[in-house]
Swiss-Prot record:
Name listed for the protein in its UniProt record: Heat shock protein HspQ
Family: Belongs to the HspQ family.
Gene3D superfamilies: Hemimethylated DNA-binding domain
Region (Disordered): 76-105
Known function: Involved in the degradation of certain denaturated proteins, including DnaA, during heat shock stress.
Organism: Salmonella typhimurium (strain LT2 / SGSC1412 / ATCC 700720)
NCBIfam families given in the database record: PRK14129.1, yccV
Amino acid sequence: MIASKFGIGQQVRHSLLGYLGVVVDIDPEYSLDEPSPDELAVNDELRAAPWYHVVMEDDDGQPVHTYLAEAQLRSEMRDEHPEQPSMDELARTIRKQLQAPRLRN
C-alpha cells in the first residue's frame, strides 16, 4: 500500500515555483501515458511515488490543471489567501463535498 503525503482538498505549494494549489485527485504512481525520456526525466522511484492532480492559477488568475510528483509539493500552512481567494474557495468546496456528499437519485 502506498501512502500519500497530501489529501484531496488540501492546499499545497509547488516546491520550486511557490505557486499555491489545491489537490483534486491522487494517483498512487505516475499514471499518464508513458513519457519519453525527453518529456519526463524522472527515475523509477519517483514514478512509483504518488502523483497529484493539482489546480493552480496562472498569472491571469485562470485555473490550470497540473500533474505533479509528491516531491514537487510542500504543505501550505495558511488556510486563508487574500491574494488568491478562488483557491481557498475551491479547497473549502472540495472538503465540504468529501464530508457530506450529495447523493444523486
